[in-house]
Amino acid sequence: MSALCPLLTPPASEALLLAQARQLSGYTLGELAVMAGITTPKDLKRDKGWIGVLLEIWLGASAGSKPEQDFAALGVELKTIPVDSLGRPLETTFVCVAPLTGNSGVTWETSHVRHKLKRVLWVPVEGDRSIPLAERRVGSPLLWSPSEEEDRQLRLDWEELMDMIVLGQVERITARHGEVLQLRPKAANARALTEAIGARGEPILTLPRGFYLKKNFTQALLARHFLLQNP
């Protein structure tokens, strides 16, 4: 058996990407960090994106923080998802930053959300906070594209949320809007403001917003593919 090592270049095919992701299954984050030559933080309070960065190193991801997918040549986005002992998601999943201005003529088909979710490599990771970060194990990966029904659900929520943004109602949107997709503030601090449209069409400053997949959506997705019990 060949020694496990990070991919130094982006994988040339989905099959190679999935094969590498499958090899990581069962390893702890600490083991993978040591083999990759990086330090494991004590917790994720100041390093929220650390797990994603670690797996990007192992899988040869190319995009970094650019708007394209993590594996641009393959059109695949990488999403790590913390799960409990039953394989259920512990938190919502960030998709992308929401555009709050310049949205005339934008459609679901050409939207950034749909582009990011067209093809996703889901990698579940143990997320129970009672387990030290270095001891949390990586689960089996899943290469996924939305079904017709999932695409319909996402589109309906996206259209509702974008209508509210365009009509100057961004400040009225709460995390309860949307069945499977939600919009909520995404900023490291409350002073990081961005331009948006106000209720009377005037420019306003507000917190940046991000699109997130709700837990019910990702739970159903994982349950269906991994045959988990889905209450």
From Swiss-Prot:
The keyword Ribosomal protein does not apply. Gene3D superfamilies: DNA mismatch repair MutH/Restriction endonuclease, type II. One of its GO terms (molecular function) is endonuclease activity. One of its GO terms (cellular component) is cytoplasm. GO terms for biological process: DNA modification; mismatch repair. Keywords: Cytoplasm, DNA damage, DNA repair, Endonuclease, Hydrolase, Nuclease. It is found in: Cytoplasm. Its main location: cytoplasm. InterPro entries: DNA_mismatch_repair_MutH (IPR004230), DNA_rep_MutH/RE_typeII_Sau3AI (IPR011337), DNA_rep_MutH/T2_RE_sf (IPR037057), Restrct_endonuc-II-like (IPR011335). Belongs to the MutH family. Sequence-specific endonuclease that cleaves unmethylated GATC sequences. It is involved in DNA mismatch repair. This is DNA mismatch repair protein MutH. It comes from Salmonella typhi.
